[in-house]
């Protein structure tokens, strides 16, 4: 930023040049000393691009100075209609921000233009070439697939061996299943054997219970079911036992009693 000021005399317009890449900010205008007709109004003008515009009006008694907020980025000319005297203009110079923005926009536009070119050159090939390349890729991929699918002799041998082993395993499994099937019939045989063994037991029970019922009818009271072994042991006693009174022992036959008495009692006599 640079301070700027200029004096514009009566009848002498002043041409102002902001400079390359610079702008001029017009901030203020004020009247100088007036020697004659102090109540006279002074009209301030600017001429830019061949057009003359009024900036404002000054009066030494009422409006001796006036503030502006005008920015010029090109050459312009200042003037006034004061007959005798001078008007002073003030402001400052600075770099042109609009020009920098325009440069940035130009650079941005150029970068935008470059992007499609690079994409067209690298990312988007011509349709014919794309078709050819795709056809080449498809043919190459097809060849690769054919090579992958074709089995070698070793693979065929291995696959046949695997099939034979699988068939052998299946046959072994089937043989095992056939051998195991007769085992399932064993429970039926066992049931038949059990039923055959159980049937005579029922007959024995029937034989044992029949005399009990006849005894029950004779007694007319509660008949206890005797154990078969106990009945068998009691039957020889009921048939007739031979007792030895001195010893208080019983024998099954007379011969046994005689031999006992001869051995024990005759020896004592």
Curated annotation (Swiss-Prot):
It comes from the Eukaryota. Gene3D superfamilies: Nucleoplasmin core domain. GO terms for biological process: chromatin organization. GO terms for cellular component: nucleolus. Residues 97-269 are annotated as: Disordered. The keyword Secreted does not apply. Residues 98-115, 153-179 have a biased composition (Acidic residues). It is found in: Nucleus, Nucleolus. Keywords: Chromatin regulator, Hydrolase, Metal-binding, Nucleus, Phosphoprotein, Repressor, Transcription, Transcription regulation, Zinc, Zinc-finger. Residues 228-238 have a biased composition (Polar residues). GO terms for molecular function: hydrolase activity; zinc ion binding. Belongs to the histone deacetylase HD2 family. Mediates the deacetylation of lysine residues on the N-terminal part of the core histones (H2A, H2B, H3 and H4). Histone deacetylation gives a tag for epigenetic repression and plays an important role in transcriptional regulation, cell cycle progression and developmental events. This is Histone deacetylase HDT1. It comes from Solanum chacoense (Chaco potato).
């Amino acid at each position: 930023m640079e301070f700027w000021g200029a004096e514009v005399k009566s009848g002498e317009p002043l041409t102002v040049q902001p400079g390359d890449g610079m702008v001029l900010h017009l901030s203020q205008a004020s009247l100088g000393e007036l020697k004659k007709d102090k109540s006279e109004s002074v009209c301030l003008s600017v001429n830019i691009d061949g057009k003359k515009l009024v900036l404002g009006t000054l009066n030494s008694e009422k409006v001796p100075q006036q503030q502006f907020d005008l920015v010029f980025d090109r050459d312009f000319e200042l003037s006034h209609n004061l007959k005798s005297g001078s008007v002073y203009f003030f402001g400052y110079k600075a770099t042109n921000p609009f020009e920098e923005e325009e440069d940035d926009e130009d650079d941005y536009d150029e970068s935008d233009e470059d992007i499609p070119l690079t994409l067209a050159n690298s990312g988007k090939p011509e349709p014919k070439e794309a078709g050819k390349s795709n056809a080449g890729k498809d043919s190459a991929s097809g060849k690769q697939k054919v090579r992958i699918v074709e089995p070698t002799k070793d693979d065929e041998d291995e696959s046949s061996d695997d099939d034979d082993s699988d068939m052998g395993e299946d046959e072994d499994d089937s043989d095992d299943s056939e051998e195991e099937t007769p085992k399932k019939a064993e429970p039926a045989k066992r049931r038949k054997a059990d039923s055959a063994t159980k049937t005579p037991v029922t007959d024995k029970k029937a034989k044992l219970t029949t005399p009990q019922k006849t005894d029950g009818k004779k007694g007319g009271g509660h008949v206890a079911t005797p154990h078969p072994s106990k009945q068998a042991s009691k039957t020889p006693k009921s048939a007739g036992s031979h007792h030895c009174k001195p010893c208080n022992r019983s024998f099954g036959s007379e011969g046994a009693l005689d031999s006992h008495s001869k051995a024990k009692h005759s020896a004592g006599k």
